């Protein structure tokens, strides 16, 4: 008997409005009482210390808030004279960043909840010696991509978000995409236009497909969502916002771009809505027309864009309060069809005007990807100064020229870990050099950020990018990497130094013309074939543009260093990842040879090669099973346990 067979029908979906919730009251208290807000910020940073390095160290730091430095975020570190360390900053993010700077450079500690930490503290806190003051030129330090919410974060709960928010604050992040609980905003909107809760649940996609649902590429995939989802995810979203508020991180929440279910016009006959095309074989949502012609008005049509937009923003405030002035929406992400009679310039103007009607301080956050944001679209903006374009892949394929030409603020981003594919990849040299060069030559670059499709490998590039927050000049990435390895592993020696030099010259080396969608993937995961396999997934590839034999030398050095550094979770993670890459590379060499032997009838060679390939698969499985970070079971367990009270069908 199924658990669901024995359960009563789910109760109607009911979510307490924000102002009536404990989160709403707390938010208002912080916003209206500066002294209380300051006390809470310092208290939360002290709590962060306890979570990261242990309670015994909390009172060893003296945190104080100070003003900005010439309008810029800043932190300073100094000795107190009584064995403690003073950290001063203009907000929680600056305080956490100052703490992180001290831990990395004086204690040789590296905190990374995603990729393993090295938290071995000295017996007592080393003295700073002189006051250190660091400021940033970048108004925005942005994090996340819609894809990250599906490829890595689909089933996260508070136990995942809390350490991630700590890490983000310690790395200077002050603007972060946040879609947790946004389904309730859509439910409260659509139920005002003829939709039942069940119909809304059918329209929404499941969390594994949220990326493409919220980017307006598809709908009704991977659902329906259980009724309990809405209240629980709103509660999580409010909890996330509470911590963000204390740190000084601004969430980027959803804006309204006119997207509605395909049957919207049937339910609302005086509206004008049309298909926006397909994406990779999936139907996109329909789009409400942003303006009415005289012919539309003569036919009795009404301006539903204004109506639904008002409802949407009212629902957004009802669910999450006035939590942010930053709104993300991309009406035509990765293509899409502009319906007949719709004007692209008017769409962009009207979408922004509706935001500004609701929130005069609104900033429209858009994604520049595949040249989807062009000068024509930007020319339609009602206020270019209240837009912010994320140039998603500035590290390898910058597309910032439309923003520069139109005078629209933009953010330099690193797009990484395409598709969540497991492969060592990244361009430290580019990150260390090009960010400051771009800023110095730009009139409108306002920040830096990470826009990874997933966050599942190559921690070096994330740490380096956010370290650039506090630098005004390019850095020597090779020296930086050696310091990074020392704190990540709790020490260093010639073996580690040589291993990382090789990694920088192989997997982490920038090559002109490099395949721009990230790391090669392991063809162990591909469907078997007697032809040469080029990828394991639709958008993947298996190109290796470095010397595999050189890379294997780095792996041998990691093996040599294992006993010295195995107590570091950071080292163990990197060890498994490097060895995994060696096995994936080796399998790739055998596969085409085995296919050729099979097709030519050389069964002896085929059996020899296929036996080696099977041995590699077994070795890969044994290696990856040694680390929780590489287990598919962890992903499955997260999916099954993310929702309280889920029946067995939902959990599976």
Task: State where each predicted segment sits.
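Polar/charged low-complexity regulatory segments
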Residues: 543-551, 558, 562-565, 579, ...
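Short amphipathic alpha-helical segments and their helix-coil junctions
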Residues: 79-83, 438, 553-570
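Membrane-interface helix-loop junctions at the exits of transmembrane helices
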Residues: 458-459, 561-566, 624
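A glycine-rich, aromatic-flanked flexible loop/lid motif
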Residues: 319-324, 562-567, 582-587
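Catalytic-core regions of glycoside hydrolase
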Residues: 50, 57-58, 107-127, 133, ...
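Mature N-terminal, pre-catalytic/accessory segment of carbohydrate-active enzymes
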Residues: 1-186, 310, 354, 568, ...
């Amino acid at each position: 008997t199924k658990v669901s067979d024995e359960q009563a029908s789910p109760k109607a979906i009911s979510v307490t409005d924000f102002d009536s919730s404990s989160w709403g009251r707390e938010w208002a208290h912080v916003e209206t009482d500066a002294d209380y807000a300051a006390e809470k910020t310092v208290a939360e940073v002290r709590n962060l210390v306890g979570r990261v390095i242990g309670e015994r160290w909390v009172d060893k730091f003296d945190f104080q808030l100070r003003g900005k430095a010439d309008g810029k975020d800043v932190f300073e570190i100094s000795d107190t004279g009584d064995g403690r360390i003073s950290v001063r900053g203009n907000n929680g993010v600056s305080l956490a960043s100052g703490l992180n700077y001290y831990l990395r450079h004086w204690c040789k500690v590296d905190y990374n909840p995603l990729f393993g930490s090295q938290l071995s503290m000295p017996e007592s806190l080393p003295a700073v010696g002189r006051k250190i003051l660091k400021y940033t030129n970048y108004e925005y330090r942005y994090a996340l991509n819609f894809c990250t919410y599906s490829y890595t974060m689909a089933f996260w709960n508070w136990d995942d978000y809390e350490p991630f928010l700590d890490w983000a604050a310690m790395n200077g992040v002050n603007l972060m995409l946040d879609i947790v609980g946004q389904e309730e905003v859509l439910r409260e909107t659509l139920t005002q236009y003829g939709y039942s809760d069940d119909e809304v649940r059918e329209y929404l996609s499941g969390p594994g497909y949220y990326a493409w649902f919220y980017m307006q590429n598809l709908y009704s995939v991977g659902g329906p969502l259980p009724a309990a989802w809405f209240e629980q995810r709103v509660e999580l979203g409010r909890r996330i916002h509470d911590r963000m508020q204390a740190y000084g991180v601004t969430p980027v929440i959803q804006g309204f771009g006119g997207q509605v279910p395909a049957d919207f016009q049937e339910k609302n006959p005086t509206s004008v809505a049309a298909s926006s095309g397909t994406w990779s074989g999936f139907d996109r949502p329909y789009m409400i027309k942003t303006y009415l012609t005289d012919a539309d008005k003569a036919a009795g049509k009404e301006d539903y864009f204004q109506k639904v937009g008002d409802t949407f923003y009212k629902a957004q405030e009802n669910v999450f309060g006035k939590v942010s002035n930053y709104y993300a929406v991309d009406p035509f992400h990765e293509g899409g069809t502009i319906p007949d009679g719709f004007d692209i310039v008017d769409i962009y103007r009207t979408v922004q005007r509706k935001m500004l009607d609701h929130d005069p301080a609104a900033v429209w956050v858009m994604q520049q990807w595949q040249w989807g944001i062009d000068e024509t679209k930007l020319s339609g903006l009602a206020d270019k100064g209240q837009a912010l374009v994320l140039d998603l892949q500035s590290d390898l394929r910058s597309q910032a020229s439309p923003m520069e030409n139109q005078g629209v603020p933009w953010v330099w981003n690193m797009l990484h870990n395409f598709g969540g594919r497991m492969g060592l990849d990244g361009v430290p040299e580019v990150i260390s050099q090009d960010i400051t060069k771009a800023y110095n030559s730009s009139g409108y670059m306002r920040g830096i950020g990470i826009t990874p499709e997933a966050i599942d490998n190559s921690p070096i590039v994330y740490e380096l990018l956010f370290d650039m927050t506090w630098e005004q000049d390019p850095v020597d990435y090779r020296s930086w990497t050696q310091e990074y390895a020392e704190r990540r592993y709790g020490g260093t020696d010639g073996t580690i130094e040589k291993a990382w030099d090789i990694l920088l010259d192989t997997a982490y080396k920038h090559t002109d013309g490099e395949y721009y969608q990230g790391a090669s993937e392991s063809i162990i995961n591909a469907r078997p074939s007697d032809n040469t396999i080029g990828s394991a997934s639709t958008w993947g590839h298996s190109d290796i543009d470095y010397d595999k034999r050189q890379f294997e030398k780095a792996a041998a050095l990691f093996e040599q260093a294992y006993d010295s550094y195995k107590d570091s979770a950071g080292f163990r993670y990197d060890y498994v990842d490097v060895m995994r890459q060696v096995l994936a590379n080796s399998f790739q060499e055998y596969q085409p040879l085995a296919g050729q032997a099979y097709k030519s009838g050389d069964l002896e060679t085929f059996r020899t090669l296929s036996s080696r390939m099977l041995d590699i698969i077994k070795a890969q499985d044994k290696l990856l099973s040694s680390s929780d970070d590489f287990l598919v079971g962890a992903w499955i367990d997260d999916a099954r346990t993310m929702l309280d009270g889920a029946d067995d069908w939902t959990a599976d």
